[in-house]
Amino acid sequence: MSTVNELVNRIDETYEVSQIEKEIKLDNIALSDLELLATGGYSPLTGFLGKEDYDSVVETLRLANGSVWSIPITLPVTEEVAESLKTGEEVKLVNNGNIYGVIQIEDIFIPDKEKEALLVYKTTDEVHPGVKKLYERPNVYVGGTIILTKRFENNQFPSYRLDPIETREEFKKRGWKTVVGFQTRNPVHRAHEYIQKSALEIVDGLFLNPLVGETKSDDIPADVRMESYEVLLQNYYPKNRVFLSVFPAAMRYAGPREAIFHALVRKNFGCTHFIVGRDHAGVGDYYGTYEAQEIFTNFTIEELGITPLFFEHSFYCTKCEAMASTKTCPHGKEDHVILSGTKVRELLRNGEIPPSTFSRKEVVEVLIKGLKKEVVTE
């Protein structure tokens, strides 16, 4: 399937901002969203959502024009800031004293956050990290088209930070007609590896695209994860069939809705297929094991523009002596070693070394070293 959808480009580093007086301070989530809006990662969006699109996304998982979009990309400001703004004006977008862009204000509105929590996250429980963040952020939303006037400096992983136009170019250069995207916020364990390699059997290339934006505090730090991906790819994957690049967005933990969002974004990066495993983008027990796969039945592949590949929970079977899933293994649960990112994190934090059935030894070494460093700096 072709992914030649038009990429939005809202970057203009020559844009004159010196005459613009008013400013909105961006938090880290809004800052990463600004970059992804401008580079086309969030195509077809050209800015932060106005009320009509926001309501439509929250209620129907579509923009007002009917295009599929499942996560509201919003710019929250305080009541005090909102009172100083009016529609029709241009305002600077600032973070940490740097001007990164401007927004042409089209809308200023107060959202129903409880409704947003219930429909987007399926819960109003403030223990849920996505809901907690939603309630912590300011209460008024500003909508409008953006322009990115300054690219980010001091990026972590500069050599792995590619815009959608660049990843598309890379895939083309490699002659890949079909590319499967894999989203992760965890180190890659053996179950992930099994799924990725199964998918790689039917496409030309694998795009490993770990999320490195804001995550919850007990997730393994991005720099440690990146090193673990590097050693894994170096030792266990064919170099000409995989490509590693980071996804600078914040994690929403919105489960099924975020699975759709992750697929749409990977389409923009140039993927034709996207892997959806068990409890994709889930947290705790808020979502059913395969709910993130079931949500895709609400949309056609044509309107998504990308083909989801669904995988069941995989495990190491001691009888098969191999990675397997219930589709390929006849043995009972007592023979299955269940692997999960949570379990790997738990073992490591307790100072235990995960067995080789869980994780490659090179990966485990990187994680142990990284977590030791973390303890020292805490």
From Swiss-Prot:
In terms of InterPro entries, this protein maps to: ATP-Sase_PUA-like_dom, PUA-like_sf, Rossmann-like_a/b/a_fold, SO4_adenylyltransferase_pro, Sulfurylase_cat_dom, Sulphate_adenylyltransferase
Please name the top-level EC class of this enzyme.
transferase
Question: What is the protein name stated in its UniProt record?
Answer: Sulfate adenylyltransferase
Where would one find the signal peptide in this protein? none
Q: Which family does it belong to?
A: Belongs to the sulfate adenylyltransferase family.
* GO MF term (any one): sulfate adenylyltransferase (ATP) activity
Q: Name one GO biological process term.
A: sulfate assimilation
Q: Which NCBIfam families match?
A: PRK04149.1 (NF003166), sopT (TIGR00339)
Name the keywords, alphabetized: ATP-binding, Nucleotide-binding, Nucleotidyltransferase, Transferase
Q: In which pathway does it act?
A: Sulfur metabolism; hydrogen sulfide biosynthesis; sulfite from sulfate: step 1/3
Q: Report whether Metal-binding shows up as a keyword of the record.
A: no
Which EC numbers characterise this protein's activity in its record?
A: 2.7.7.4
Keyword rRNA-binding listed? The answer is: no
List the catalysed reactions: sulfate + ATP + H(+) = adenosine 5'-phosphosulfate + diphosphate
